[in-house]
Amino acid sequence: MTKFIFVTGGVVSSLGKGIAAASIAAILESRGLNVTMLKLDPYINVDPGTMSPFQHGEVFVTDDGAETDLDLGHYERFIDSTMTRRNSFSTGQVYENVIAKERRGDYLGGTVQVIPHITDEIKRRIHEGAAGYDVAIVEIGGTVGDIESLPFLEAIRQMRSQLGRNNTLFAHLSYVPYIAAAGEIKTKPTQHTVKEMLSIGLQPDILICRMDRTMPADERRKIALFCNVEERAIVGSYDVDSIYECPEMLHDQGIDNIITEQLQLNVQQADLTAWKKIVHAIQNPKHTVKIAMVGKYVDLTESYKSLIEALKHAGIHTETDVQITFVDSESIEKNNGDVSMLKDMDAILVPGGFGSRGVEGKIAAVRYARENNVPYLGICLGMQIALIEYARDVAGLKGANSTEFDLKCAAPVVALIDEWQTADGSVETRDESADLGGTMRLGAQEVELKAGSLAAKIYGSGHIRERHRHRYEVNNNYVPQLEKAGLVIGGVSAGRERLVETIELPNHPWFFACQFHPEFTSNPRKGHPLFTAFVKAALNNKKA
C-alpha cells in the first residue's frame, strides 16, 4: 500500500515547499524506497502553458508532453523518477473533468457539489499518480487559508480519515521571521497558520520552519507546545548557498526517522554520499566562467529555472563556478544593438521564449558571438534567432524572419508548424486560429543526428530523445540555401517531416543551437552532455 506525505505551506508563498518536498523525497529514496511526487495547483487555469512567465515562472515540460509547474523540474532533479501528466493537476483540470462527467450523466441527475464530487476527483487523481510506489509526496500549492486551496485540503483531510495515521503524514512549512529591530525570532505567524490548519481538521505531524538562522531550543519548545507537535518534529529549513544542501540539512535533523516511524517503514539507513559529493563540487570549484544569458524575462529569473540549474550541473561536472549574467535583450534593442556588455563574457546563451519583444536584441547577440568566435548555445527560440541572423547576414536572404514576428516577411525562414508526427506515431495539425493552450509540439521527440556533426560528438550517439515546447519551426524550403551558405543541419526529427532540430557552424570554435529543451532532463547527479560541452567550450575560450 502506498504511503502518503502531504506538504502544505503557510504564512506566505515562495517559502520553498517544492525544495523541501523534493529533499524529503531524495532522503527517502536514499533509504531504498520507490518514491514519486505530485503537485496540486489550486489555480483555475487548466495548466500553466498559457500563463505569463512573469506570473508563474518557468513552464516545465514532462516526457509525455504535459505543461506543468516548475516544481516538477525540482522533483526530477532530486529523485530518479520521470514525471508525467499524472504528477501534476490543477483546479481547472479537476473541474473540467467533473463537469464533463456531469454532462455525460455520470452522476445520474444528482446535484454536483464540491463535497463529495470535487474532493472525490482530487482523491482519485492523487491515487492514480501514486499507484505502484512505496511513498507519494504530495505538494499542495498556495498557502493554507487561501480560498482556492480549500477543496484540496478537504480532500487530504478525508484521506487521513480513510487511510489512517500510519499511512498518511502532514508536513507543514511555515515562516519564522527574525525581527532585527527587536533582536527576536517570532513564532506567532507559525502558531496562526497551524491554528488555520486545525480549523479545517488538519493537524501537522511535522513543522518545517523556514528561517534565516538556527532555531534556539526555547523557541523550538514554544512552537511544539502551542502547535501540538512533537519537539523533535520541529525542523529548521535554513538559508543555504545551494538547494542541493537541503537533503543533508533535513536529514541531520532526523526528519526521515520521524517519517519512517510514523509510516511504519522498515528500511535501510539513508546514504547521502552522492549529495555530499555534489555539494563538495559546488563548494570547491577549480575554474570560473562567465556566461551571458540574453533573454527578455530576465527580471524574473525563475522563468529560466531549469536552464540555470542545468548550467550549475555542468559546473559540478567540470569543477567550474558558472557565473551567469542576465542581459535584457530589449535593452540591446533600445540601444541600437549595443552589445558592449558581452565583451567580457566567455560564452553566450539565448534561451527559449515567445513573441517579438526583444528579438532584434537577441539577433545582435548572436551576430556578436558568430563574428567574434564566442561559444554560443541557442535553445528553442535561440536556435530560430541564430538561423534568422545567419540567413540575413551570411546567406543574403533579405527580409529573413519568423512569421511569429512578421507574418508578411519576405523570407519566412521560420514558420508555424502546420503538421507533425508525434513520438507515438500519430499526426497533429495546427493553423493560425488554433487555441494557444496545449497545442504546441510538446514532450519527448526522437532526433536523428548527422554522423560527424558537433551534435553527434556532444551526445556520443546518432539518435537521441529530447523534450520540446514550440509552435514555430525552421521552414524546410529554405534549408538548401542555408546549407549552401555553410550552415550545418546536425539533427532532424525522426518523423516523416524531417524538421530541423539542431544547427551548427563548422568554421566556429563552438556554435550550436537546438530546437528542443535539453535543460528539462539535466540533473545534478549526471548533468547533461550538451551543457557540459558548452561550459567546456567557455573554459577553452577563456584560456584562449
UniProtKB/Swiss-Prot annotation:
Binding site for UTP: S13, K186, T187, K188, P189, T190, Q191, K222
PROSITE patterns reported for this sequence: GATASE_TYPE_1
Assembly information from the UniProt record: Homotetramer.
GO biological process per UniProt: 'de novo' CTP biosynthetic process; pyrimidine nucleobase biosynthetic process
Task of the protein: Catalyzes the ATP-dependent amination of UTP to CTP with either L-glutamine or ammonia as the source of nitrogen. Regulates intracellular CTP levels through interactions with the four ribonucleotide triphosphates.
Record field: catalytic activity: UTP + L-glutamine + ATP + H2O = CTP + L-glutamate + ADP + phosphate + 2 H(+); L-glutamine + H2O = L-glutamate + NH4(+); UTP + NH4(+) + ATP = CTP + ADP + phosphate + 2 H(+)
List of catalytic residues: C380, H517, E519
Note: CTPSs have evolved a hybrid strategy for distinguishing between UTP and CTP. The overlapping regions of the product feedback inhibitory and substrate sites recognize a common feature in both compounds, the triphosphate moiety. To differentiate isosteric substrate and product pyrimidine rings, an additional pocket far from the expected kinase/ligase catalytic site, specifically recognizes the cytosine and ribose portions of the product inhibitor.
Chain sites annotated for binding ATP: S14, L15, G16, K17, G18, I19, D71
Annotated L-glutamine binding sites: G353, L381, G382, M383, Q384, E404, R471
Protein name (Swiss-Prot/TrEMBL): CTP synthase
EC number of this enzyme: 6.3.4.2
Every Glutamine amidotransferase type-1 domain range: 290-544
Swiss-Prot/TrEMBL keywords: ATP-binding, Glutamine amidotransferase, Ligase, Magnesium, Metal-binding, Nucleotide-binding, Pyrimidine biosynthesis
